Structures are given as C-alpha cells and as structure tokens.
C-alpha cells in the first residue's frame, strides 16, 4: 500500500493540497474476489480507510476501486463508513445518486477512454493525436454543459503521461481548458458535496 511504503510521496501530495482517493489495500487484491463474501470485502475497505485516516490525518471522502472492480455491495459499505463519493462506474458524464441501505452516495463517474494508459500505451496514439482527442472530448462536453453540467475525468499515470513530450502536450491541453469560461477544476469530494446539496432524488438502490 503506497500510504505505508511511499510516505514521501504522500507528504508531497498533502503539501500541495491535492486530493488523495483510496484505491484499495493492494492493487491486485480486487474487491470482486469477495463478491460472495461481503464480510471480507467490508474488512478490506475498513482496513484501507483506517490506514488512510492514520496517514493522511483525515477521513477519506471518495473511493476508486483498483481496476474499477467494485461489487454490488461496495457503495453501501462506503456510505456506511462515511464516504460521500464512489468513482468506479463509467456510465455517465454527470454525477448521480446511488441509494444504498445506509443512505445515498454520489457516483462521480470515471473514464477508461479518456485515460492516458488507453490513449497512449494501449491505443498507440501519437502525442498530438491523444491531445486532440482530449480537446474533442472537452469541446463536446463543454457545449453540452451550457445546458447542464458535465464531468471530464482524465485518468493519468506518471509512467505514461510523465514522458517529457507528453508532459508538454498535457500542459497545452490544460491551458486550452483554462482559456474557457465557466470551467471548474474540483476534487471528487467537492463534486459530491455540491451534488448532495443539489440532487432532488435517488435513482437506484445497491443492497
């Protein structure tokens, strides 16, 4: 677990005020392994959240399962343990409420398409083509956002986007987005907090 093994990285993230989102106890210990053993899944999540609070100094508010492999029980466990955002699902460009047995939790959707690993490492796009893809995605969502807000989640991995030529291109994309009006750069916690204050109803139940 990086919280245990890479404290200097965690300290640097905290100093910069970046959001830290728990990503399971171990990358290869998928929650789906416990799909038929909810007690074990609950224990893994609880252990992860306890260590997070010990190291980070505050409770976690959002969760992204390793490999996006949550179970039907995951949202309810997260809500039970005090989280407000669950980020595994890929099915929308807007946040929405998941109604669990412990109350609602906000789904802040993730994206596998708009993700440096799938764009470059798997997709084989050139740096310029990849950034053009990001701009096209942003432009479409920006237009739709004139009617109702949209989320553009860009998944980045240091060993992929961290190549010098890609860093320069990423900087170009960020400046492109910053040049637009009415664009918000929130954390998942901020999105969920805002959405909980706005959403009128729950739309599905996870038990």
Across the structure, where does each feature detected by a protein language model lie?
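Conserved beta-strand edge residues that scaffold enzyme active sites
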Residues: 27, 67, 92, 191-192
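C-terminal domain-boundary segment and adjacent tail
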Residues: 85, 135-207
